[in-house]
């Protein structure tokens, strides 16, 4: 199938999908606060009940709900939940009432039926917890960022090599976004030719009053490029077809929050990938209150034969539903609305990878490289405000 045939066939498939029962749309997901964003999709189990038991621990960030949504829709069974805060545990049980409450992390790790542990601890604690989990013979699924220091990354690499376990990362801005997964397929098919440049714009809503204290402590959250920048570096590696990249420029600043001096509310970086592709990312905490979603995330992919623009969470002033894909090539222009029509295959692939020791969902090298680039960019960043 040539490039044009692929695009036409894809458009026809998406159009036909409009006649099928839809998954929960972006409008049906709570989207105004990024920290509460937990996408839901169509159940697509790859295992039966009780065949792949997991635990959810350290519920410091509400991304744990998106992580568990994806895993349970793929067939995983949440056997345990553990956190030192009983209020967090009670809230989790409202969403996942079948989980049992563990008295400690040790109780979770002692259960031979638990195959994977999902964790959304304070950013700076995720890496060390992962090593403990892997040493206990479990695979580990961390919220992003998985690390806040290079030492943590190196420790995790050593633990993976020693134990043979997985340390996967919830890079949700691609893995849990249908437009981004659709673009992944377009790029990998060769539909836009060789990728020259990737640009990701990722504004987020700060919601300062509802954030925990650790969110504003530099040593605990890691810096803006380490944190929400990690999503963008992962997307560049994927869309750019890169296994490595060089950070040529990075900057961070605090432009609007003098009462939180350790917060970085703006960051940007430029990278050059080993495939020849170039990258620019911008991240910030300045989503205006008038936007009904947590951020107007955009991705622009320039290929030698076509361009792609993703309007991930909203089409501003036009549609509040997200997952818009705009494609332009030599033959014309297309706008595809893919919400509810692509799904979130990463989670099922991750479960099968854990069972079979494969790497279809994501390679370990890729997961770690995205974090490594974010740490390098953070360390190199010039403070501009």
Please identify what each model-predicted range represents.
Residues 299, 316-330:
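Short polybasic amphipathic segments
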Residues 8-20, 24-48, 116-118, 274, ...:
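C-terminal helix-rich "cap/oligomerization" subdomain common to oxidoreductases
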Residues 62, 337-348:
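Active-site loop of classical SDR/Rossmann-like NAD(P)-dependent oxidoreductases
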Residues 124, 147-209:
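A contiguous active-site-proximal alpha/beta segment in oxidoreductase catalytic domains
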Residues 26-96:
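N-terminal Rossmann-like dinucleotide-binding module
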